[in-house]
Amino acid sequence: MSTSSSNGLLLTSMSGRHDDMEAGSAKTEEHSDHEELQHDPDDPFDIDNTKNASVESLRRWRQAALVLNASRRFRYTLDLNKEEHYDNRRRMIRAHAQVIRAALLFKLAGEQQIAFGSSTPAASTGNFDIDLEKLVSMTRNQNMSNLQQYGGVKGVAEKLKSNMEQGINEDEKEVIDRKNAFGSNTYPKKKGKNFFMFLWEAWQDLTLIILIIAAVTSLALGIKTEGLKEGWLDGGSIAFAVLLVIVVTAVSDYRQSLQFQNLNDEKRNIQLEVMRGGRTVKISIYDVVVGDVIPLRIGDQVPADGVLISGHSLAIDESSMTGESKIVHKDQKSPFLMSGCKVADGVGNMLVTGVGINTEWGLLMASISEDTGEETPLQVRLNGLATFIGIVGLSVALVVLVALLVRYFTGTTQDTNGATQFIKGTTSISDIVDDCVKIFTIAVTIVVVAVPEGLPLAVTLTLAYSMRKMMADKALVRRLSACETMGSATTICSDKTGTLTLNQMTVVETYAGGSKMDVADNPSGLHPKLVALISEGVAQNTTGNIFHPKDGGEVEISGSPTEKAILSWAYKLGMKFDTIRSESAIIHAFPFNSEKKRGGVAVLRGDSEVFIHWKGAAEIVLACCTQYMDSNGTLQSIESQKEFFRVAIDSMAKNSLRCVAIACRTQELNQVPKEQEDLDKWALPEDELILLAIVGIKDPCRPGVREAVRICTSAGVKVRMVTGDNLQTAKAIALECGILSSDTEAVEPTIIEGKVFRELSEKEREQVAKKITVMGRSSPNDKLLLVQALRKNGDVVAVTGDGTNDAPALHEADIGLSMGISGTEVAKESSDIIILDDNFASVVKVVRWGRSVYANIQKFIQFQLTVNVAALIINVVAAMSSGDVPLKAVQLLWVNLIMDTLGALALATEPPTDHLMHRTPVGRREPLITNIMWRNLLVQSFYQVAVLLVLNFAGLSILGLNHENHAHAVEVKNTMIFNAFVMCQIFNEFNARKPDEMNVFRGVNKNPLFVAIVGVTFILQIIIVTFLGKFAHTVRLGWQLWLASIIIGLVSWPLAIVGKLIPVPKTPMSVYFKKPFRKYKASRNA
């Protein structure tokens, strides 16, 4: 039997490509140049999609160029050695489990003298008549003889004091007793890194280690020459600043680690249905206990070890345990079920016999430490950018080092008192070493500032922040890269049922007895025989349930939304659910199949009568019918009425109703296979059916969906509906949701049936896919074909899905979005993001957050590169011209702290704005630094460099310091430069918030963290300048100089407005940078 999926269907949608963007601008005429740049096959940092990338491709870029401080740089990215280790571990997972099992049994044998293979009756465990170790051993070893010894599944259930039909009691005390006796369904997790491990990793930065060595050397020389009281200041201040950077880095990393750990815990907390006290209730997987009866459906994860009570066509995918992609059929001959496996086909009920650490899955999970590391395309590109900038910074630092040493040893440098620092034959060795250490420290500190370590941190911060906030917006991120990829989505292929609609279904129209019923659920006009057949077909051909509370309260109906609607309708017709199920038995079932759009059961009445009941898509079931039962209970030929029923189906579909037909037929008992093996292979007859009823089910559109679709359209994201429903129903819902704007649009291929699409050639599908807005009567494979066609056209595709058979499309799409409520565990595991409320509006929020991730990273890049450029030019020019630098080592470390940690924290946590949804999608290969960013950072950098260099060379006269002591005047001037430089960065943080907007303050009140960080930075700067003079090489400034510093920083605001009036070329700057290299490479290859 083919693998089937649950009732929900997926939708797929995509739009035209928007490859090139300029902070959200449209495509340009110079597209060819840009496209040529984007598809550079030799670019080691060009990995546009890491979703299914191999370890080899991810390793390639790490080895492609010199990488500074690799151990620290890559602390946020995937550990490829660990990934390979886990792959090997998974391949040997079965052998690993067997070793653990043998060790456990050996331990138990030693401690409790339990003999292997013993047939001694089990000792009791608490109030239960079965021993925990024997129960666990039976299930793990899949020992049929032990199972028979206990009296089969029924005997085990009795010993566990559980009812195979109603489960255990709902009493909380009983659940606690079972946890005490048999354990809980949890397992001990390996401890993650503690804070000290993060502290050690932060310490691994090569430049910081060099600075510490320089600080220790300076400390020793200083104490030796100047004494302890004054001599410790230079070296001690550098050492303290380095330690501060290390601690702040470790704290930041540790916080992000805890956040990701909490999100991982959310991912593992599966919600599932169990039978307790005869009713179906939803609980956490952690609350499953031994004795629970759990219904299993296609796509479910087996939540614990157990044995099969009953099932039909039940097939289990055990690859997660065995490492082999093999589907294993389960029946009474092979009833053992292993935790962690997936239901590939069929339905069944299981009795839980082992939970948590007492299962193989629990032992494996406890023994394997889960790593949250994952490579994202943005991290790859940022590390490439950071490496390039780091190499530039290293080169500049070497130039400065050589220049300072040359100037020093040629006697052209002076100390603060104006005296020549080096005089051959006069200057002592200790002074020379001390001066050289200071020079070396300056060069190393330039590297610290130049190497943008904050870029990877900014990615981690913004991803962690976004993931936490997306949880509040009902989206659980399973794969980090999906956050940023969602910002590039050009099309969303959305399911209809439950995503665009409420998934709250009711039967509002019924055709039965050959005519339309006046009241959909009033049986007065129907013959009892017809009502009886409808009732039997509904009661038996369902995975739902009806529970009658003992206190006489309202009836509780469980199952999928469609089944609940039909069960409720049949109950009102007079269906006796429990009676029907007790008087007849299902001998074979064909679970609902999303390919065939129908499901059926063979029911044995008494000893000789067999009825086959079918339920499914109305027009498909109708096509299989040759008769219908009229209101008198007699059978009539359907030929004369077929057109009437077709018109009825079309009419209901146009009113956005889902049409479901119920039909049956009789079957001679001698034509039913006798042996179970033959019965499992038996294909239920689906011809010569008798039509019993057609129902129209209303599933209202979700409030807010129309607005969400409008937002997507204005954001350049095409929404497409892909549904298994009738094309007319799909069209009606699409019009209601705004996916189709008018009836005139509803022509092929804008709306198309899945069958028509799948019969096209591959080239034709690619052409047609661009135009499709609605696809009706589609199968999961049709959705996969649509996704493939759209991706070949260059679209970045997001797909929603909930069924097991949707897994290939979810995996193929750039972003797979599974449904948290209606989605199967198989679909969730194949997806990148889980939409917790199944709401399309939440999908749109994910798009906003995806764009926000990219935008926040760009804000931080603009801010950090401005600091990099300004600090480098100021120190290099000053060093080359005067032999000294105005920004000292400790000061640059403080600036580094502002940039790398505080700046990243402030800008990476900017919430998304409506402005983001007025842009077209971010191009998959759009340059990280856009022309707008280049303009902004160059304007600010040139301003800062100009002002601060003027202060450096003419500051004494400008500030009126000529009449003061020269050494003190130089200290005041340098302090002023440092203070003004920091003020520029504080005010420029506001500019970085809005790279392409005039009003940089818009929404600042919505980010209190940003305001707090700016305030804290300002206060700390006051403390450093005013109270930590000896430590930071500063002196106190008067209020006039403070005001001047603030004004210098404040000028960056009007300057930013003026700068934004400067037009920028449409061709990305990176094209001009790369063209000479490409031409050189081409000439060499020629």
Swiss-Prot record:
It catalyses: Ca(2+)(in) + ATP + H2O = Ca(2+)(out) + ADP + phosphate + H(+). Mg(2+) binds at D802, D806. Activated by calmodulin. Pfam families: CaATP_NAI, Cation_ATPase_C, Cation_ATPase_N, E1-E2_ATPase, Hydrolase. Coiled coil: none annotated. Keywords: ATP-binding, Calcium, Calcium transport, Calmodulin-binding, Ion transport, Magnesium, Membrane, Metal-binding, Nucleotide-binding, Translocase, Transmembrane, Transmembrane helix, Transport. This magnesium-dependent enzyme catalyzes the hydrolysis of ATP coupled with the translocation of calcium from the cytosol out of the cell or into organelles. This is Calcium-transporting ATPase 9, plasma membrane-type. The gene is ACA9.
